[in-house]
Amino acid sequence: MFKSLSPLVFATALITLAGCQSKPAPEVDEQARQTFISDMQRALIHSMATADTGEQIGAVLLEVTLDGQSAPTHCKAVRAPVKYRMTLPADVMPTDINALTRLVEAQCWKTIYPVVPAAVREENGTVDVRAPLYIVLPGAAQAPDTLRRKAYAQRDFFWQHLLRDQPVTSIGKASLYYQANAQGKVEGCLVQLYPHPLRTDAFRLDGNLQALLNSRCMALDLSKLPGFAVDAQGQATGYTEMDYAPWRFNRP
């Protein structure tokens, strides 16, 4: 059963979350409830806004089920009701809704979610959240040659080659600094692991994982990295960050 959360619009964000809904829970501490709502909104907005995608515009209703560890077990996106679609800016043209819902569902599975207050959960430990999303990612901002799009494409490249097939047992962020020559051969790599701001409780420093990621990074051919470029000295340097969690295992 989905509970009702008050609408909220981020007018300055590329993606705005109109609100979330879940089951009524009058016994829940109001401050804890509001913190969860705010963190849930922040997580979804960040995830959608940083997707490596072309132009995407529209209003989508996303249904998410989280288990007792705040891992997603269900992600379903559909066209939002008319009352949400009518609030999109008048000067934008919605893009293909099927492509948009596929993107939202894919990002839903990649998102790191906040801890759900115990009193909000169902008897089986889960919680269902319904989130109307306004998505405005214009073509100019999403062009492949923009700095932000290159950054997201590079993040996904390193995810595919370093972390995707790793069955991690904790939640965190991995930062990566690299240096390569003009041919893309890696000459230096530094991977660091640290807590995700929404799930500091679930982070464990894993020296073996850190060493493995460093080793994998050193073996990469970065000539295939999106946006790969060298400076006047023939060196390529860069930085990226990746979120990781058990439910992201073997997901794109």
Outline where the language-model segments fall:
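Bacterial N-terminal signal peptides that target proteins for export
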Residues: 1-9
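C-terminal motif of bacterial Sec signal peptides marking the signal peptidase cleavage site
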Residues: 16-19
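Charge-biased low-complexity segments
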Residues: 21-252
